[in-house]
Amino acid sequence: WTYDNVAPTIVITASDGSNAVSDGATTNDNSIVLTFTTSEITSTFAVGDITVSGGTLSSFAATSSTVYTATFTPTANGATTIDVAQGTFIDAAGNGNTAATQFNWIYDTIAPTGEITATNSSGNAIASGSTSNDAQITLFLTTSEVATGLTIEDFVVNGNGVLSDLTAVSTTQASVVLTPTGSGQITVTIPANSVVDAANNANTGAAVFVWSYDGDQPTIAITAKNAEGESVADGLVTNDLKLILTLITSEATTDLDLSDITVKGANVSDFSSVSSTEYNVDLTPIADGAVTVSVKANRFTDSSNNNNIASSEFNWTYDSIAPSVTITATNSAGTSILSGSTTKDDSVFFAVAMNESIANFDQNDVNITNGQIASFTPVSSTVYNIVFLPGDGVNTLEIAAGAFT
């Protein structure tokens, strides 16, 4: 006779058919095989002795008098439990079993998702689709659950940029530094199947971040026209009482104003915006002489906060002084002939001299009486020679006011 008052025990283990599934594990297996091992022979253990949550049992079978198996199929994603309560079966001596240690398993087929965000060196957020002149930005990949397997090679970069310094911030976030190599749009993508969660589910959707780097400084050009709308070229001399300057920037700006214009020899007024890249301003000379207009560097910015490059200087000379002309005369011997005098010279050499350069003076501007012009010769832009053949009596040679400019 054998006296036995020891209660049988039972242990629950599991596998996915080829690999063990440990208690508390998370996997994406569609079903697992449970194994129930008793400490001694029993003939009363049945499928009804097993209590489950989050799934159903099937294919219960006795492998031996101490080993039983069953297939557990989850009904939804989430936690599952398998229990064998105390006293549900007995050994040969009629001792009821002790309760099994609960087996816990999490069924997870949900793929992790990811989102890419960014900040600049000051910690300010950089929105996807935005443009800035930051020399570097830090990208953050945040996953919906703990994920592993991410490498810097998983990031796909399209555009002028390189990645460096991949760092694990937490179990659900990693950071990487993006450095632009030139202006333009940069797209950073984490493709599908780049990371996996604890259940080995790979991300199915791509995470994308788009950013444009703008390191180009805006430029500005200055042109001018007069009140009649005629173009006034750089370096020109005119007698216009006012010019209208047009300032054209290479890209949109909102902070260009009258105070950004440097001017000498004139005043500027009536600054107005035609568009985000075009501005007009009136230029009024203070006195006769040279006028210069420019916009110095770092006076305005573009939308990415890049400072402007200095403009080329616009030069204009305001001249309201009428040109004067002096006429002198000599004979063939080089002797001066005074106005109003009487001589017997059969030819007279006139020298016409202006006090400034003239471009539109010709023989037709010379009025004569009682004689004829034998030759008209421009010596320079301010000196002209005339050979005059006089007639008997009073001879005159004159240049009327307004004949040239």
Question: For each of these PLM feature ranges, what is it?
Answer:
Residues 1-405:
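Non-catalytic beta-sheet/beta-sandwich ligand-binding modules that flank or precede catalytic cores
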